Amino acid sequence: MSPPINRARRIYKPRNVLLGAHKTTVRLEPVLWEALGDIARHRGITRQDLMREIDNDREHGVGLTSAIRVYIVKFYRDRIGDL
C-alpha cells in the first residue's frame, strides 16, 4: 500500500520553463517535479531538456502540464510492468 500523501506536498509549485524561444510557467505538485528530475537524471539529461522533448512530442491541443503528467505516469508504468 502506498504511503499517505501529505497535503502540503499537493500544493502546486510553479516554475518558469524556456521552450525554444518561448517562456512559459508550469505548475506541478512537488512530488511530480521530483519525479521529473529523477527521470531526467536516469536518462542523463537535464529536466529542461526532458520538458523540451515532452513539449515537442505532445499532440496538438494537449497542454504541456498534462503531457508532463502523462509522461511521468507512462515512464513509471513501463518500469513496473504488469501488476
Give residue ranges: language-model regions.
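Amphipathic, hydrophobic secondary-structure cores in small proteins
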Residues: 18-72
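A detector of short terminal or domain-flanking linear segments
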Residues: 1-20
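Short, solvent-exposed charged binding patches
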Residues: 73-83
